[in-house]
Amino acid sequence: RIAPKGFKPDVPSLDLKSVDGSLNALKSPNPAVRYLGFQALKNFGDSALLKVEELLQDKNSYLAARAIWLLPHLGENGKKKTVTLLRSKNRDQRLVAYRSLRRTGENMVTHARALSKDTDAGIRRDVAISLRFLSFDQSKDAFLEIAKQFDGQDKNYVEAIGLGAHGKESQVWEHLKNKLGFQKSPMWTNAFARITWRLGTNKAIPYLKERVQNTEFSIEQRKFAIESIAFINHPDAPDALLELGNTIQEEELNDVIVEWMVRQGLTDWG
């Protein structure tokens, strides 16, 4: 590290036997010292709570965030304080509080449902990813709220929904389709079409075929439906594209079908 000539660093002594000393260690820029402070404060438990809560008010948001990561480890009162931060006016505090509760193994069903309605898209994305570790029954309400607020443009948002739905894609897609009133493909919004593309369930194939064949949709929308079928890793997908290739009249769409048949035949379907 570059330093002025004659510079002598003043390294503070490490005191992990007191709450104040451990708190100073937690504030350290050195990750190893910070870890020691974190562990020491964990061991102090409820007796360190007041001092850690004071750190929440620090003007340095990074130091305040360290307090949130620690709070759920300080007994039931610390966990309750963390839960209250899920309703903070500060979006960063809400996000870190949600993540810190997850890390402690807290049952996140109720918290996920609450924050699935959050006004901040970044927080909803985080909630969506966390649903990966919940069952369909536990997560379906949160998925519905998150899907309702998708603008159809945010690629990270739709990817978060896909990651969260891993292993239960068909159930999530059917639930969203029915609850959002998209039982017929002409009713679909572009947002739901993109969610369908990401979830990649074979349950969507008949609806996607209908979109490809329906001339009321734009060429781009029909191409996107072809692409959505192509990304479905199920035996019904190549059969559907083959059938469409034999019935679609537009050369532009047929070229897209052939391109995807070749590409996927050499990779996912090969």
Short names for language-model regions:
Residues 2-270:
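Long, ordered, helix-rich scaffold segments
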